[in-house]
From Swiss-Prot:
GO terms for cellular component: chloroplast inner membrane. Involved in protein precursor import into chloroplasts. May be part of an intermediate translocation complex acting as a protein-conducting channel at the inner envelope. Pfam families: Ycf1. This is Protein TIC 214. The keyword NADP does not apply. Its main location: plastid.
Length: 1507
């Protein structure tokens, strides 16, 4: 079975088994019945073996009751029978008294230890056990605490509830759980009976004595939880039910009746509130589920139906809306196949994306120019905005109102009383639910202030000198603020107006030809925030106000019942003292809508339960009750709504029966005037056509046909029947108005009409006689005319069936045929008629005939004796009718004969006909008898033949099966051998092709992403983003542990299969033990492993001294003879024939770095350009992969070639490098300080200060190189952090934060005012001093994570172990059922597109990266469009040509390695991220630090269908 169906099946069995774990009263009752029931005899005890059926019957009652609960989820009217409190309270009392009576009937004999019942049959025991457990389980969910029902409801609200396998698994889990309970009770009681019979008897006695009393007491206590309608009011009349719409009882859904806030099914205790003290009950916790609902129901914009909505935090709403705004999808997933066939659409789509790519590149160039002019980088970085309003203003995202800026940093306190005693005026106020007060604590908002302060005052802080150097200490960047934080902190920013970029510049690409109004419609949020009362879309400007945010909070706020009246404490204390802590105050509320004064309350004494809570109108032993406001909003879930129509239609049919049938179901008010006029005109035309054209024409044709058949015409009868037809003009609803038909007038304001026909004309071929018409029942005398000229029973009803035209004609033909048949069967001649007449006149013969007739009648009565008398009467009636028809024909024949013959001839014929009639009856009786005997013999012979045929067929099959068994075995052996031979051939051929592919693809490095080959169908396995995130998480931790991930990794995951393929190509898969791989093998493999290659930004943080160490090693290996030639040459000239064999002393290092001083000076002038390069170029241009290759070159044997090529490119530029963009990884070790304070000459002292760090790094790397295998490297212990230093650092940072918070929030602050001497000392100790805490802790932390090769070893070794245990490696390579990549493309795994750092990027840089991976240019074009962007800022043409030639070589090398992407594949690649929202949210919840991150699971829930 497929894994898509297996996973829900196992989940269903597990959840169904969990539903049976709690032991409720129904199970205890089943065990009691199992113990106590006896057979009924005095000397026989009911043993366990014979009582198994009773326990089984009781468990069947449990299962059947739970099955009814499951049906109640789909059919709410079933559950309404026992949930309604009136019915429930009345029914439950009767059940208890019946059970008490049954307990009294059980007699217990103490001497014999036997239990006796009055009933004797075992069936009564089983039936009683079934009914008792069934009724108790049905009454359990409301009266008794029943976790089984709660678990069942949670199960069916799960995401797999619509899958049939999940339902089957759930039912199987229920059966298995109860089966285990059945077997366990049997085993325990049997062992107890055999090992300790005395204890077994004592248990029976005690259960009989105390079980009934305890059960009844417990049931009555639980019954007190629900009010009885005869004693207590079922519903409070004084509550204003403005929000509850009046509905019929069967239209309400069962959660409304079960959790309705206006129904007293549960006692409600009011929490006491003390206004003077800030108790924890008063404080509103915004992220607590007790105060706010996670799910609520809102009406949709399109159809107005209610849908289930989830309250999203901002961390998920960012991804869901950014993808829609970036991708801008116009079509659904089902239309992708039709799109691929349309080439015109593909061309338009590619051209549109090219234009967008050029637009983004132009914006990058404009930002670079403004950076060169001196503007701040923070102003040019794109802010994360989601959409635009109608005025083209940016609006930030606020899906969850609790995360907005006006609510952030504040506390909420309850301001309302209990919801039971609120008036209409209270709900009209918007700010009536809660009041707002500011916090005085340090929250995230103040921490953000501290970071902003440090970044803005970096100039003042950097002026602090330590001995001889100036080093900046700010290593972080300010958090990207929301739109609200920007508005609140405008006064605190210290930006100069001269440096601010003007608004007229098109930096963000807003001046686009595309209409933003249409774009705004496409970027509508997928999870809307409409109110549940069906309000319209809220204006975006009003959302910024605090009142609107409070109204949104009110929608998801669940009010708790509170009571904060100001009672006099002295009076309460007196009451308590008088009652000796046994009595408590009870408050009775008046019936008025408003709260009464304190004088109107009567304080009677009630039982006090030693709780500081007011019980309200009902007292009980319950704690605090939270009234769930989510269920008050009518939870119209699709599980309940689409079944309500069945009940509504059932009651609607009953109402329609009582209504008059003449009243139509439609209404004319909604129709237009033109439509009414056309319909009335057509009706009147149909009436005229029917009366004057149609029916007269049919009458003429009918009579003409009758004359053709030599029948008399019926003109008079037809015209008289037609004259009886009357046309009555009625209103729209069928009420009679006036006789006659008139044409309607268009200009008259008349109501639409109906035309009624009284005594409608029925056209028949043969009109009935008067006697026949009187015998038949008259049909309906009226009918309505249709627009099509047809008759209906009622207006707008079904078409009336017209009588058959040929009915009487067919009846007459039957009579004629019967007469002719009788005439042919008569054999007697006309000569014997006289003798027959004489014999008939003889009385003896006449008596014989009468005797024969009587004998036949008696014989028929005997045959029909077993039948009912009614059938006999019906048979007699049929005989009489046939005789009557025969007589009518005979009379007509006689009338015709009298015209030509005499009276004597007539007498002769009459005598002959009588004799023929008698002879025909005798012959028919004989024929019936003979036919009966013949049919009986035929059946016997048929059975005998059928039996013989079956026996012969069985014998033949037996013989054939015996002979063919040997032949089948031979064919099976042949098939097995052939299949085995083919498998071996397939194995050898695949090995040969793998060997060829390894040789062909071994030295290639493909960079093109493989997103186009991803399947569009969603998989049910582990998501790829979750795997990548877990790998990243292990990388960031101290000790990586990937084995736990691989245990849950499914066998058919496509990402795992492709990793296996790639390892097979690299030659690593063949090793049985991956622990013994050498370092060189792993380095050769890691340089092509593109998926887990971190970005340049992360390498700069993890290994800042790696580049300096490599440069130092390079200059040490230079021979001394070559150094002199370098010093004598020009600074930028480098000899190509350098040999890297010897080394150099550290003392001459400064001299050798002098030729590269112009490069360092150019880099120092462009400090801001480096930052922007990290943000934009490294994430948008494909050419930056060369930097990663250059980084890997220092680990490989191709070191000489790569370095030689790099220095050769520098020689070609030759001093033209003022504005040259150099890779940021080459400058990660350089300090970033201001341009005007940078020293142009690098002194030897600064180099010596950094040499100890290099020496330290060298020792660590030398230690790693000495280790031969990765297994030994796994024993490397990381540097341990010092906890006391961390605590010291934390305390000092808190002191600095307090000083910043206390300062005034206005303008730019000078260093003399903001920074004191103590704070300067703290800053020096933390950041500037030699033994600074901050940098040391970071270095120790980086040393843990730096060993990335060990991480790769743990990652891939777990995959190899998984493959060696389960499946052969070659079988995995050939399985392509769920493969991500096509079989015809043999290339290594390359997924740079899925780097996790992309989530940090702003939207428009992420879009640029996606567009760069599409490669829209043609095949013959070697230089992509991005190359123009990189050298567009050169001033001279020569510089452009030199730089273009150097970069074109890199592009040519890259394009040789890339596969050409087709146009159709680009669209598939572009649409791929829309099917991966779940993966992106899975990553996003770990990266963005927002509250309540566990709610990302809503993306796993299926979209709720239309209701």
């Amino acid at each position: 079975m497929n894994t898509i169906y297996l996973v829900p099946f196992f989940l269903g069995t597990f959840s169904g088994f969990l539903a049976t774990l709690p032991i409720g009263p129904a199970k205890i009752l089943a065990v009691r019945k199992f113990l106590l029931i006896s057979k009924g005899n005095e000397n026989e005890v009911y043993n366990l073996k014979s009582s198994n059926t009773i326990l089984l019957a009781s468990l069947c009652g449990l299962i059947f009751a739970q099955f009814l609960f499951v049906l109640a989820l789909q059919f709410p009217f079933l559950y309404s029978l026992w949930v309604k409190p009136h019915f429930f309270s009345f029914f439950f009392v009767l059940v208890l008294f019946i059970y008490l009576y049954q307990i009294k009937n059980i007699q217990f004999d103490i001497s014999n230890n036997q239990f006796l019942l009055k009933s004797e049959s075992n069936f009564s025991y089983q039936q009683a056990a079934f009914l008792e457990t069934l009724l108790l389980q049905l009454l359990n969910p409301v009266v008794l605490p029943n976790p089984v029902f709660c678990r069942l409801t949670n199960v069916f609200l799960f995401r797999y509830s619509t899958i049939s396998t999940f339902f089957a698994g759930n039912f199987l889990g229920l059966l298995s759980g109860y089966g285990i309970f059945f077997l366990s009770t049997l085993f325990l009681l049997k062992r107890l009976e055999e090992d300790a019979p005395t204890i077994y008897r004592l248990v029976k006695i005690k259960i009989h004595q105390f079980f009934g009393i305890i059960l009844v007491i417990f049931s009555f206590l639980c019954l007190s939880r629900t009010p009885l309608p005869a004693i207590k009011p079922f519903k409070l009349k004084e509550i204003s039910t403005t929000f509850s719409s009046t509905k019929v009882w069967y239209e309400n859904i069962w959660p409304d009746s079960f959790f309705g806030y206006d129904r007293w099914k549960r006692p409600l205790r009011l929490i006491s509130v003390d206004e003077k003290k800030s108790q924890p009950n008063n404080e509103l916790k915004p992220f607590n589920k007790m105060f706010f609902s996670q799910f609520f129901f809102e009406g949709g914009i399109q159809d107005g139906n209610y849908r289930l909505v989830h309250n999203f935090p901002q961390s998920l709403s960012l991804i869901s809306q950014n993808i829609n705004s970036i991708l801008n999808n116009k079509l659904n997933n089902s239309q992708i196949e039709s799109i691929e066939k349309n080439k015109n659409f593909i061309d338009e789509w590619i051209q549109e994306k090219k234009n967008r790519q050029n637009q983004i590149s132009q914006n990058i160039n404009t930002k670079i120019k403004h950076i060169e002019k001196g503007s701040y980088l923070e102003e040019l970085v794109e802010k994360k905005f989601s959409s635009f309003d109608n005025n083209k203003n940016k609006i930030s995202k606020q899906m969850d109102p609790r995360l907005n800026a006006d609510i952030r940093g504040k506390k909420f306190f309850f301001k309302n009383k209990s919801f039971l005693f609120l008036t209409k005026e209270f709900f009209s106020k918007k700010d009536s639910l809660f009041a707002v007060e500011k916090k005085n604590l340090i929250d995230t908002y103040t921490k953000n202030k501290f970071k902003l302060f440090l970044t803005e005052n970096s100039q003042n802080l950097s002026s602090l000198e330590t001995r001889t150097e100036k080093i900046p200490f700010i290593t972080w960047k300010p958090i990207i603020q929301s739109f609200y934080d920007k508005n609140q902190n405008l006064k605190e920013t210290s930006l100069d107006q001269n440096n601010v970029v003007k608004d007229q510049l098109d930096l963000d690409g807003l001046k686009n030809k595309r209409s933003w109004h249409s774009l705004f419609k496409k970027i509508s949020p997928p999870f809307s925030s409409e109110s549940s009362m069906g309000e319209k879309l809220i204006n975006f400007e009003n959302e910024l106000k605090q009142e609107e945010n409070n109204s949104k909070m009110a929608q998801i706020y669940k009010p708790m019942p509170l009571w904060n009246l100001n009672f006099n404490k002295k009076e309460l204390n007196l009451l308590k003292r008088q009652s000796n802590n046994k009595l408590h105050l009870k408050i009775f509320f008046p019936k008025s809508n408003h709260l009464a004064d304190r004088q109107n309350f009567v304080p009677p004494l009630m039982p006090f339960f030693r709780r500081n809570e007011f019980p309200g109108t009902i007292t009980s032993r319950r704690g605090k009750a939270v009234c769930w406001n989510t269920f008050q909003k009518k939870p119209h879930s699709p599980l309940f709504i689409h079944h309500l129509n069945l009940l509504k239609n059932f009651f609607a049919k009953r109402k329609k029966i009582q209504i008059n049938q003449d009243v139509p179901t439609k209404s004319w008010q909604s129709t237009s005037k033109l439509f009414q006029f056309l319909r009335d005109y057509l009706l009147s035309l149909q009436a005229y056509i029917r009366k004057y054209l149609k029916l007269p024409f049919l009458i003429i044709i009918k009579n003409f046909i009758r004359q053709l058949f030599f029948q008399p015409a019926e003109w008079e009868k037809d015209w008289t029947n037609l004259s009886k037809e009357v046309y009555v003009q009625c209103d729209f609803y069928g009420k009679a108005g006036s006789v006659g038909v008139k044409l309607p007038n268009f200009f008259a304001n008349d109501e639409p009409k109906q035309i009624k026909i009284v005594n409608p004309f029925e056209l028949r071929f043969w009109t009935r006689s008067f006697s026949e018409q009187s015998s038949l029942q008259e049909s309906e005398n009226s009918s309505f005319l249709n627009v099509w000229g047809r008759e209906t029973k009622m207006p707008f009803g079904k078409v009336k069936k017209s009588p058959s035209f040929w009915q009487l004609f067919i009846e007459r033909i039957k009579l004629i045929l019967q007469y002719k048949i009788l005439k042919n069967l008569s054999v007697s001649s006309s000569i014997d008629s006289i003798e027959i007449q004489k014999e008939i006149k003889n009385p003896r013969i006449q008596s014989q005939i009468d005797v024969q007739q009587n004998f036949q009648i008696e014989q028929s009565k005997r045959n029909l004796g077993t039948k009912d008398e009614e059938k006999v009467k019906n048979l007699n009636k049929k005989i009489i009718d046939n005789n009557f028809k025969y007589k009518t024909t005979k009379r007509k024949i006689v009338n015709n004969s009298t015209q030509n013959k005499t009276f004597s001839d007539f007498n002769k014929k009459e005598k002959i006909n009588r004799t023929r009639q008698y002879t025909f009856q005798n012959m028919s009786i004989l024929l019936q008898r003979q036919w009966f005997h013949f049919y009986r013999l035929f059946l016997k012979k048929e059975r005998e033949l059928f039996f013989e045929l079956q026996t012969k067929m069985f014998e033949m099959k037996k013989i054939i099966s015996r002979k063919n068994t040997k032949v089948i075995k031979i064919f099976l052996k042949l098939f097995y051998n052939v299949s085995r031979f083919l498998r071996s051939l397939y194995y050898q051929i695949s090995e040969f092709f793998n060997w060829l592919s390894l040789k062909f693809v071994k030295n290639q490095k493909e960079i093109s992403s493989n997103i186009d080959a991803f399947d569009l169908k969603p998989t049910k396995n582990l998501s790829q983003a979750y795997i990548i995130h877990s790998i990243w998480e292990d990388r960031m931790m101290s000790r990586p542990n990937i084995t736990s991930l691989m245990k849950s990794w499914n066998q058919n995951v496509s990402l795992k299969n492709n990793l296996e393929n790639f390892l097979n190509k690299q030659g690593i898969l063949g090793n049985e033990k991956p622990e013994n791989l050498t370092e060189h093998q792993w380095q050769e493999w890691l340089k092509n492993f593109r998926v887990y290659t971190p970005s340049l930004k992360l390498w700069a943080l993890w290994a800042p001294n790696y580049w300096t160490q490599a440069v130092e090693q390079y200059w040490k290996e230079l021979p001394s003879s070559k150094l002199k030639s370098i010093l004598n040459q020009e600074p930028n000239k480098i000899n190509k024939s350098l040999n890297f064999t010897t080394s150099l002393d550290n003392s001459t290092l400064n001299k050798f770095l002098e030729p590269h001083l112009p490069l360092f000076q150019a880099v120092q002038k462009q400090k801001k350009l480096w930052k922007f390069n990290i943000l934009s170029r490294n994430y948008t241009e494909v050419t930056n992969d060369g930097d990663i290759d250059s980084f890997f070159s220092w680990q490989t044997t191709d070191f000489d070639k790569k370095t030689h090529y790099l220095f050769d490119t520098l020689k070609k530029v030759k001093g033209k490098d003022k504005n040259l963009i150099v890779s940021p990884i080459n400058l990660s070790s350089l300090p970033q300080i201001k341009e005007n304070k940078l020293k142009r000459n690098l002194s030897q002292q600064n180099i010596k200060k950094e040499l100890p760090l290099i020496q330290r790094e060298k020792k660590r790397l030398d230690f790693d190189i000495k280790l031969q295998t990765l297994r030994q490297r796994g024993t490397f212990f990381p540097v341990s952090t010092r906890r006391w230093k961390l605590k010291k650092l934390k305390n000092k940072l808190e002191k600095l934060a307090k000083t910043v918070i206390k300062k005034p929030q206005s303008g730019e602050l000078s260093s003399s005012l903001t920074i004191g001497e103590k704070n300067k000392k703290l800053i020096r100790e933390l950041f500037v001093a030699e033994n600074r805490l901050f940098t040391n802790i970071l270095e120790n932390w980086n040393s843990k994570v730096l060993d990335d090769e060990l991480l790769m070893y743990n990652t891939i070794s777990s995959i190899l172990r998984f493959a060696n245990k389960n499946i052969n490696a070659l079988a995995i390579n050939n399985s392509d059922s769920l493969s991500l990549f096509p079989r015809n493309i043999l290339r290594p795994l390359d997924l740079n597109f899925l780097l996790l750092e992309d989530i940090y990027l702003p939207t428009y840089l992420r879009e640029m990266k996606i567009l760069e991976y599409f490669h829209f240019e043609k095949e013959n074009q070697n230089i992509p469009s991005t190359s123009t962007v990189s050298h567009s800022h050169f001033s001279n043409k020569k510089e452009k040509t030199i730089y273009a030639e150097t970069i074109n070589k890199w592009h040519l090398i890259l394009q040789q390695k890339q596969n050409v992407i087709k146009d159709r594949q680009t669209i598939v690649r572009f649409l791929w991220p829309t099917h991966r929202l779940e993966d992106l949210s899975c990553i996003n919840r770990f990266w963005l630090g927002t509250a309540n991150q566990s709610r990302f699971s809503i993306l796993r829930i299926q979209t709720v269908p239309n209701i």
